[in-house]
Amino acid sequence: MANFTAADVKRLRELTGAGMLDCKNALAESDGDFDKAVEALRIKGAKDVGKRAERATAEGLVAAQGGALIELNSETDFVAKNAEFQALADQIVAAAASSKAADVDALKAAKIGDTTVEQAIAELSAKIGEKLELRRVAHFDGTVEAYLHRRAADLPPAVGVLVEYQGSGKDSDKEAAHAVALQIAALKARYLSRDDVPEDVVASERRIAEETAKAEGKPEQALPKIVEGRLNGFFKDAVLLEQPSVSDSKKTVKALLDEAGVTVTRFVRFEVGQA
């Protein structure tokens, strides 16, 4: 008996863009496990699967203040443009900065005047007639640089980056951190260093590289070198410090940070509509 339904097939198809039969077979092979099904589709050559699987259906905005970054969702971009919605986001991120809330539940309980964040969201939701959701929050205690990016001039920021860093206290420290924030916004780094990549992710990428190389008919004796090359390509794409700098493609982000005497300790990137 299959451990998935027609609705599961539809969901996987929406996430990946793969064909219905391919999705059905991938779910069957993975016993209904979505992550394994996505991996199976990638092995079979659906090259855009990983990126499409990150997408979610949501509108809204990101906001930053102090060491805090939030994502507040709405159902439509019409509401995202609403002045009251944007004002609420400003109040919520201010509450996040002052309360240092570590997660959404803690932030929902934080105060905005005489009410809570959760109550304020519910009240505006009832007034506007659209579901609103506080999707996520991040807070860093150290020295931070924030960057917000708009997809269109008439829309609020949809991409937000928060970078925590250490330097020598020079003005150039902030400039270097800002350049890194722009880099993260543009190239979507997922990890700071290679050591931060979870072992299961590395194992999955290695397995995908090996299986795709075999499917391409590569010589058996050449597989180890090919797999390592593709794995290094993954690190170059996903790891911030190993990415080529957008400002100087001949140097990595790590090289430019070393030259500036700045150390990035952590970062977070939120994008409306993505996981």
From Swiss-Prot:
Q: Where in the cell is it found?
A: Cytoplasm
Task: Locate the region Involved in Mg(2+) ion dislocation from EF-Tu.
Answer: 76-79
From the UniProt annotation, give the residues forming the signal peptide. none
Q: Which gene encodes it?
A: tsf
Describe the family membership recorded for this protein in Swiss-Prot or TrEMBL. Belongs to the EF-Ts family.
The alphabetical list of record keywords is: Cytoplasm, Elongation factor, Protein biosynthesis
Keyword Protein biosynthesis: yes or no?
Answer: yes
NCBIfam families referenced in this protein's UniProt entry, alphabetically: tsf (TIGR00116)
Any idea what job this protein has? Associates with the EF-Tu.GDP complex and induces the exchange of GDP to GTP. It remains bound to the aminoacyl-tRNA.EF-Tu.GTP complex up to the GTP hydrolysis stage on the ribosome.
User: One GO MF term, please?
Assistant: translation elongation factor activity
One GO cellular component this record assigns the protein to is: cytoplasm
| Protein name per Swiss-Prot or TrEMBL | Elongation factor Ts
Record-linked SUPFAM superfamilies:
Elongation factor Ts (EF-Ts), dimerisation domain, UBA-like
Superkingdom, natural source:
Bacteria
The main location is cytoplasm
Q: Would I find Protein biosynthesis among this entry's keywords? A: yes
- Origin organism is Mycobacterium avium (strain 104)
